[in-house]
């Protein structure tokens, strides 16, 4: 989910970088069996884990008749046990609706892409104050932290890989959003209906389904006109999954007309460049320049015109905090002046947006979602509807971004007046859709990366992108 660039964002001098080097993967992606999606007995074992050779002990002491009877009994016993192999325990359904806790029996979720750090001489100087400030974050990177993140990432992978198979011209945006959100809630095993349940696990923010020149922050809203996917559309799918507030934010773009292939290739390459350059002590301005250099080396031919792919200037990648999709650091896609560095323990959403238009996104009409200030107080609110709505928001979403669709799913009614009051008081912030000029096309790719002490883990990486 893109973070809008602040008004004082400035462009700066060039910094040399090498964005085209490949990422050295320490451990390649696991197959389904390796990641716990398939379960069965090991070779030479029964379903109960018994070794078949153990039954042979003492066989030479038996008579021939006893051996025959024993063999028949063992064959009969094995035949009955083989029936267990036909059960679907440990397998995912299509569409994915089995909670991951029922698939990964030991509740240990697979690692994502592990990448070793590349040491740069100019990055050896550490800043003691920043180390101290982030010490608590690093200490939180324990087994529970990693397992929560890996579970959220596995949910994201399974849901999106199914959704990609049904995303075709003619499908409604509301159906896609429903499939994604139903899948996430089923796999996390938290439907989010009971008070506070959505804070345990589920959607981290409303599903973003942005077409063509809509760059970010659009989702189907109740009562709005239905939008149907067309063959010539460029669709960006951006959704987040959280487990105990640990948010995985990842996005991809789909297009059916091959004329947009170079646009998608440019943006995907730029995102991978950002992931390669990311690391402990990495300078954010260097990462930004590397991203822009790669993205703007591409062109796309539309209507017999060669159009350069441009990096969007006023939306950025961002760090992620617990229960907060946008932290206090930003990663632009263009050259910039900043002294900020990435630090050990940081979690970043490395995303890039490329456009065939002016590459500057403006607010459009409508509302994508809402975000509640964690320090918000009901003091000063005069409308009872606003007070009641604020309590519902805090109890069910906290600081997670939510949409009108989520409120109505909870059974909240007649909330418009109360919401206007909360927004006007600055207690709740609204997000508008962000658009480039009409007739242009915007693409997006995004991954979440954990900057662990000894390596970085591209937690949302999958076989699809």
UniProtKB/Swiss-Prot annotation:
Binding site for a divalent metal cation 2: 249, 318, 351, 446
Keyword Cell division carried by entry: no
Obligatory cofactor(s): Co(2+); Zn(2+); Mn(2+); Fe(2+)
Any one GO molecular-function label of the UniProt entry: initiator methionyl aminopeptidase activity
Record's catalysed reaction(s): Release of N-terminal amino acids, preferentially methionine, from peptides and arylamides
Cofactor note: Binds 2 divalent metal cations per subunit. Has a high-affinity and a low affinity metal-binding site. The true nature of the physiological cofactor is under debate. The enzyme is active with cobalt, zinc, manganese or divalent iron ions. Most likely, methionine aminopeptidases function as mononuclear Fe(2+)-metalloproteases under physiological conditions, and the catalytically relevant metal-binding site has been assigned to the histidine-containing high-affinity site.
Binding site residues for substrate: 217, 326
CDD domains: MetAP2
Record key words, sorted: Aminopeptidase, Cytoplasm, Hydrolase, Metal-binding, Protease
Gene Ontology CC annotations of this record: cytoplasm
PROSITE patterns, per database record: MAP_2
The enzyme's E.C. designation: 3.4.11.18
Any one Gene Ontology BP term: proteolysis
Record's compositionally biased regions (Acidic residues): 44-55
Entries under SUPFAM superfamilies matching the protein: Creatinase/aminopeptidase, Winged helix' DNA-binding domain
List of residues binding a divalent metal cation 1: 238, 249, 446
Keyword Cytoplasm appears in the UniProt entry: yes
Region (Disordered): 1-92
Biased composition (Basic and acidic residues): 1-13
Pfam families assigned to the protein according to its UniProt record, in alphabetical order: Peptidase_M24
Family: Belongs to the peptidase M24A family. Methionine aminopeptidase eukaryotic type 2 subfamily.
General function of this protein: Cotranslationally removes the N-terminal methionine from nascent proteins. The N-terminal methionine is often cleaved when the second residue in the primary sequence is small and uncharged (Met-Ala-, Cys, Gly, Pro, Ser, Thr, or Val).
UniProt-recorded name of the protein: Methionine aminopeptidase 2-2
UniProt source species: Ajellomyces dermatitidis (strain ER-3 / ATCC MYA-2586) (Blastomyces dermatitidis)
């Amino acid at each position: 989910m893109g973070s809008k660039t602040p008004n004082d964002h400035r462009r700066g001098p060039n910094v040399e970088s090498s964005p085209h080097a490949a990422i050295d993967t320490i451990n390649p992606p696991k197959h389904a069996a390796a990641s716990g999606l398939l379960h069965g007995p090991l070779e030479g074992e029964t379903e109960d884990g018994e070794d078949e050779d153990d039954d042979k002990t003492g066989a030479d002491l038996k008579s021939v008749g006893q051996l025959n009877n024993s063999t028949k009994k063992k064959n009969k016993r094995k035949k009955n046990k083989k029936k267990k192999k036909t059960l679907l325990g440990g397998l995912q359904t299509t569409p994915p609706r089995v909670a991951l806790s029922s698939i990964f029996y030991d509740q240990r979720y697979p690692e994502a892409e592990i990448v070793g750090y590349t040491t740069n001489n100019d990055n050896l100087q550490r800043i003691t104050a920043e180390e101290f400030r982030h010490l608590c974050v690093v200490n939180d990177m324990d087994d529970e932290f990693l397992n929560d993140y890996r579970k959220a990432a596995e949910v994201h992978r399974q849901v999106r890989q199914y959704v990609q198979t049904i995303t075709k011209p003619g499908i409604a945006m509301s159906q896609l959003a429903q499939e994604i959100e139903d899948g996430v809630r089923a796999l996390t095993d938290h439907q989010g209906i009971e008070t506070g349940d959505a804070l345990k696990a589920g959607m981290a923010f409303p599903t973003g389904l942005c077409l063509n020149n809509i760059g970010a922050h659009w989702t189907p809203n109740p009562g709005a006109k239905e939008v149907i996917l067309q063959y010539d559309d460029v669709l960006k799918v951006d959704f987040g999954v959280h487990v105990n507030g640990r948010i995985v934010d990842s996005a991809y773009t789909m297009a059916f007309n091959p004329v947009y292939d170079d646009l998608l290739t440019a943006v995907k390459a730029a995102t991978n460049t950002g992931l390669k350059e990311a690391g402990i002590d990495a300078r954010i301005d260097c990462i930004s320049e590397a991203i822009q250099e790669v993205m703007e080396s591409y062109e796309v031919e539309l209507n017999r015109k060669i159009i350069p792919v441009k990096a969007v200037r006023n939306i950025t990648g961002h760090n992620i905090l617990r229960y907060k999709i946008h932290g206090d650091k930003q990663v632009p896609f263009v050259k910039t002046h900043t002294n900020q560095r990435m630090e050990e323990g940081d979690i970043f959403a490395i995303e890039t947006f490329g456009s065939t238009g002016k590459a500057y996104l403006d607010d459009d009409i409508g509302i994508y979602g809402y975000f509640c200030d964690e320090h918000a107080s009901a003091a000063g609110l005069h409308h009872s509807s606003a007070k009641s709505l604020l309590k519902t928001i805090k109890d069910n979403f906290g600081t997670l971004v939510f949409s009108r669709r989520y409120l109505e799913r909870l059974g909240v009614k007649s909330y418009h007046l109360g919401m206007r009051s909360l927004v006007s008081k600055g207690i709740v912030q609204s997000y508008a859709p962000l658009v480039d000029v009409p007739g242009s096309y915007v693409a997006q790719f995004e991954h979440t990366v954990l900057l662990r002490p000894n390596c970085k883990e591209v937690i949302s990486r999958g076989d699809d992108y």
